[in-house]
Regions:
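Membrane-interfacial helix-loop-helix connectors in multipass membrane proteins
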Residues: 111-132
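Terminal transmembrane helical anchor/hairpin motif
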Residues: 38-41, 159, 163-227
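Helix-loop-helix units of permease transmembrane domains in multi-pass membrane transporters
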Residues: 66-98
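Long, hydrophobic alpha-helical segments
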Residues: 47-69
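Hydrophobic alpha-helical transmembrane segments of polytopic membrane proteins
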Residues: 126-153, 210-219
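Selective transmembrane-helix segments that form parts of the transport pathway or gating/packing helices
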Residues: 16-17, 86-115
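Aromatic- and glycine-rich beta-strand/loop motifs that create alpha-glucan
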Residues: 1-22
Length: 227
């Protein structure tokens, strides 16, 4: 598994994917600051936007581009014809994507702490960090989801599905259906944790996100093995 991760890191070393890990949270923060800079709830609004839209689309772009480049270059022939266990390879690709998303989330929270000080917001830094971590855990299922979807369709279709998922999350956010819509889990959790409301129901969102991520990872790996 370590060798697979090393190979994946080398593949993205000189690609735009490595740059996007740093660039996407910067773009997100700059754009949201430009829109909400005069709002007293600036930090909360930005955290909310990140939880249901920016993180989703950023994961789709990062994982999607990594899969897209390899699909376009070789159609995975060098992997499919190698003695490497395909199940382990796909799990390694997913873990690589998760590491990238974790780095991106760290960059985002650092930028958000800077925004908090610049605009003298009152949100507690500890709660901000907890909220970003919670949203990340509840959204990790998106990594195997996009890895599988881009591989069987294409990058644009996958991003389109992700965009529609986020839009639908907005309409469902104030209904009982939001608990059943995975694209809504990050936003629901952020709305609670940013206020320090760590109720049991919020932890169930994290658990569901992790379980769904494991299920989709296994599904994506077996799908790749049978390709």
């Amino acid at each position: 598994m370590t060798n697979i991760l090393k190979v994946e890191f080398l593949k993205t070393k000189h690609s735009v994917v490595r740059l996007l890990v740093w660039l996407l949270p910067v773009i997100a923060v700059l754009m949201m600051t430009a829109v909400f800079w005069d709002n007293q709830y600036l930090v909360q609004l930005m955290m909310g936007q990140w939880s249901y839209f920016w993180l989703n689309m950023s994961i789709g772009l990062l994982v999607g581009l990594s899969t897209y480049y390899q699909k376009q270059a070789t159609k995975f022939r060098e992997i499919l014809t190698s003695p490497q266990d395909l199940l382990s390879y796909e799990i390694g690709r997913i873990l690589h994507g998760i590491i990238q998303v974790c780095i991106m989330s760290v960059i985002f929270i650092v930028l958000m702490i800077c925004v908090r000080f610049i605009f003298s917001s009152t949100e507690e830094i500890g709660l901000m960090i907890c909220s970003v971590i919670g949203v990340l855990l509840a959204s990790l299922w998106l990594v195997p989801f996009y890895s599988w979807l881009v591989r069987i369709t294409n990058l644009y279709f996958a991003l389109g599905i992700g965009f529609l998922g986020s839009i639908l999350a907005i309409f469902l956010s104030h209904t009982t259906w939001s608990m059943w819509w995975p694209f809504d889990w990050g936003m629901l959790l952020n709305n609670l944790w940013i206020k320090g409301d760590f109720v049991f129901g919020s932890w169930s969102l994290v658990i569901c996100g992790l379980i769904l991520g494991i299920i989709l990872s296994i599904f994506s790996a077996y799908s790749f093995k049978k390709q």
